[in-house]
């Protein structure tokens, strides 16, 4: 490697350390203090505060609309997969406890347990939650009913129906919201919002970029993450050109669903009758994980305005999914809810890899083994391409002496040098870029794995050797606060090993690209799910074995295509002249 290459590698490593420092500093910082919110003193009713979607105002928690004083109480309903804790404070699911999924300290995963508003709570303005409900539990089907009558005579009845043990989707809760006009006058509302509850990292190492608010309108899914609320600028350079934002608010027709997601879990509210017309979302300061501040996201799905004549009643129905980001379960909910997986542009590759990994797991019963076997299958399928690329690179290596002579001859004429090089490649039938082909093919596969392994619930708490959780970085210890993750380091080492034994093409630009690849992949994988580093390390080792099988072969003796063509033509003529027996 030349001097410039070493300088670039050192700068990349320094960038990795700087990014790790900034990552911890930025995402451990709590959001700006909230502005004035509704407060209540004993014996008084809280005052409703109506937020407006302006960047200047901060909003950390939804306000409570004015409501009569009612004693707070909770009611739990359980199934074999989840326990739902209902609260009459805002008439919704205070938290959903997923009994089959473990979080820190081997405790069950709790959704919506981080100081956020209840799932299924309603409000009549963006950022507002209506409280003061009476709560009843009725029937054998575990239904929980909330009732409230507002001062103008609008009666609100909310009925939650948790899933049965044998339900096809064990995390889908039904919700009916009914409005009845008990007054003698016409009542009008400018629509209402149904809360998605909140989402926040479950594990201290979960990536904040997966804490998102997603919504689908007209079949198109849009989303923001917690960084959307940050001031515009470059924080570590002290540059800022726009202020922090506190409320995300959008008005769109034909909204099918809205939801909040963390890295491996999500809560989605889907309208089943009337299409939604608006959404809102805010960021909030969630409960600390391992003494680290984490940020959460909460939001709501809004329905259009309605009017009720005296005695008239209307109702809307919703489905609420509060559970793991399971592709099949989300796809079964319809309406493109599987977009909550956030697979991105290589989603079709991610879906295939997830299906293949789960299929192999059905035979092996181990996800680390499934990833290794899947990697070997992929490498075997790409063997013809890899073998052809290796042969082409060996041809390039055979031309290396000629290229050295040519560089010396035309060292002061770069354009002439390039022209002569390309002429030589054509004469000898060599493709100088063929060595990059296997890497170009594997890049989409890598990003498919990257997206899949970053969201696939299957990998949570799956172990491999020293790795306790394949969905998290494999940090063994820290040095001055910097995590030492072994698998990405082994992965980078295997890439360097592969680079050393790969036939040199003689092309300086191609060699420089190869030098950078270990550092680039190290940055990509260092703080990511260790399963990704396991995949790339496995494929590197398999490539090294392939290279060792071919490296001891002598370099090919190259001839110009014109010479080969003449010899073949002469052989053809000789064959035609041969007398028939």
Language model features: what each stretch is:
Residues 369, 458-467, 508-513:
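Membrane-water interface of transmembrane alpha-helices in multipass transporters/channels
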Residues 449-494:
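Conserved catalytic motifs of ABC-family nucleotide-binding domains
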Residues 1-62, 383, 387-434, 476, ...:
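Terminal, Lys/Arg-rich, intrinsically disordered segments and adjacent short helical elements
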Residues 1-380, 557-581:
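Membrane-protein biogenesis/insertion across secretory and organellar systems
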Residues 433-448:
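Transmembrane alpha-helices
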Residues 6, 264, 298, 315, ...:
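Active-site lining segments that contact anionic ligands and/or coordinate catalytic metals
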Residues 339-408, 415-416, 422, 426, ...:
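Transmembrane alpha-helical segments that form the functional core of multipass membrane systems
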């Amino acid at each position: 490697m030349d001097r410039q290459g070493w300088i670039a590698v050192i700068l990349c490593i320094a960038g990795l350390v700087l990014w790790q420092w900034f990552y911890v500093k930025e995402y451990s910082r709590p959001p700006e203090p909230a502005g004035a919110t509704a407060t209540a003193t004993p014996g008084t009713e809280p005052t409703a505060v109506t937020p407006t979607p302006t960047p200047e105002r901060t909003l950390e928690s939804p306000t409570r609309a004015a409501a009569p004083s009612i004693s707070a109480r909770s009611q739990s309903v359980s199934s074999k997969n989840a326990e739902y804790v209902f609260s009459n404070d805002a008439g919704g699911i205070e938290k959903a406890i997923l009994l089959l999924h473990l979080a820190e300290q081997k405790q069950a995963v709790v959704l919506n347990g981080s100081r956020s508003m209840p799932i299924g709570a309603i409000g009549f303005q963006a950022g507002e939650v209506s409280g003061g409900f009476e709560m009843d539990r009725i029937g054998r089907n575990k239904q929980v009913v909330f009732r409230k009558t507002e001062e103008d005579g609008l009666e609100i009845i909310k009925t939650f129906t948790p899933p049965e043990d044998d339900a096809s989707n064990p995390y889908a809760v039904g919700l009916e919201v009914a409005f009845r006009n008990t007054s003698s006058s016409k009542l009008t509302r400018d629509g209402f919002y149904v809360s998605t509850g909140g989402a926040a990292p479950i594990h201290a190492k979960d990536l904040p970029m997966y804490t998102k608010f997603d919504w689908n309108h007209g079949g198109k899914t849009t989303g923001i993450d917690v960084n959307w609320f940050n001031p515009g600028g470059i924080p570590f350079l002290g540059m800022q050109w726009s202020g922090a934002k506190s409320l995300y608010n959008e008005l769109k027709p034909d909204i099918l669903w809205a939801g909040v997601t963390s890295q491996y879990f999500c809560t989605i509210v889907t309208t089943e009758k009337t299409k939604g017309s608006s959404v809102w979302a805010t960021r909030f300061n969630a409960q600390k994980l391992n003494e680290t501040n984490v940020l959460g996201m909460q939001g709501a799905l809004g329905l259009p305005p309605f009017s009720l004549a005296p005695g008239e009643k209307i109702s809307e129905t919703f489905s609420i999914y509060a559970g793991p980001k399971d592709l099949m379960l989300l796809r079964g909910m319809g309406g493109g809810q599987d977009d909550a997986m956030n697979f991105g542009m290589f989603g079709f590759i991610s879906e295939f890899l997830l299906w293949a990994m789960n299929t192999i797991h059905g035979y092996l019963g181990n996800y680390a083994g499934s990833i290794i076997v899947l990697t070997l299958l992929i490498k075997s399928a790409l063997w013809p391409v890899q073998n052809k690329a290796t042969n082409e690179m060996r041809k390039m290596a055979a031309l290396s002496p000629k290229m050295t002579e040519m560089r010396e001859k035309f060292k002061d004429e770069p354009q002439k040098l390039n022209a002569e090089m390309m002429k030589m490649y054509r004469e000898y039938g060599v493709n100088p870029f063929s060595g990059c082909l296997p890497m170009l093919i594997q890049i989409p596969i890598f990003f498919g794995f990257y997206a899949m392994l970053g969201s696939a619930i299957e990998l949570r708490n799956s172990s491999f050797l020293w790795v306790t959780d394949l969905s998290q970085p494999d940090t063994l210890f820290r040095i001055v606060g910097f995590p030492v993750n072994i698998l990405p380091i082994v992965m980078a080492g295997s890439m360097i090993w592969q680079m050393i034994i790969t036939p040199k093409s003689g092309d300086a630009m191609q060699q420089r690209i190869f030098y950078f690849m270990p550092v680039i992949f190290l940055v990509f994988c260092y703080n990511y799910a260790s399963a990704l580093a396991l995949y790339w390390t496995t494929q590197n080792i398999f490539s090294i074995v392939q290279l060792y099988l071919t490296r001891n072969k002598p370099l090919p003796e190259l001839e110009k295509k014109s010479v080969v063509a003449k010899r073949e033509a002469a052989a053809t003529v000789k064959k035609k002249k041969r007398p028939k027996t």
